[in-house]
From Swiss-Prot:
Keywords: ATP-binding, Nucleotide-binding. It comes from Methanosarcina barkeri (strain Fusaro / DSM 804). Pfam families: AAA_17. Disulfide bonds: none annotated. This is UPF0200 protein Mbar_A0975. The lineage of its organism: Archaea, Methanobacteriati, Methanobacteriota, Stenosarchaea group, Methanomicrobia. Belongs to the UPF0200 family. ATP binds at residues 8-15. One of its GO terms (molecular function) is ATP binding. Gene3D superfamilies: P-loop containing nucleotide triphosphate hydrolases. The keyword Nucleotide-binding applies. InterPro entries: NTP_hydrolase-rel (IPR022970), P-loop_NTPase (IPR027417).
Amino acid sequence: MKIIAFVGMPASGKSEAARIAAEMGIPVINMGDVIRKEVSRRGLEPNDSNTGMVATQLRKCEGMDAVAVRCISQIRDAGSDLIVVDGVRGVAEVECFRRELGEGFILISIYAPIEIRFSRVQKRGRSDDMNSIEGLRNRDERELSWGMGEAIEASNIEIENNSTLEIFKKDVVEVLSNYLRQTPSE
């Protein structure tokens, strides 16, 4: 089994890469869904403040790898030789996945400059997004405090996402296709 996980700063293109993977028929597990589910379970409004608070509390109470731990059973139950995990946020999550899943774990970082990322945030309209570049910087700092920088440094491959969607899609398809070719067919 191969697990490909995407890591990157907010709005760098992780979810877009995961969407491309899904279009290619690769099952996707979204780590952010774990947080959004917990926000909903607690009866909170799904905004940036609440999702950030819940994510921080989970990591404080259950460990910095709490979200990864909650994803392990989903990964094992997916029944596929290749799975994409969207949204690694810290090095503890990387270490958890590598420990639990072994050498089949591949980490791909996605990079985009903050100005491009903020432009994307303004267009996507998610309820947990921030509405100023300062808000994005604050979210960056929060995620860096979780070990995001170290997770990015631990990646096996980097994909730059600072051009058009078509170029990014081509790059993602190329990388994922290499792993699809290496995976036994069912």
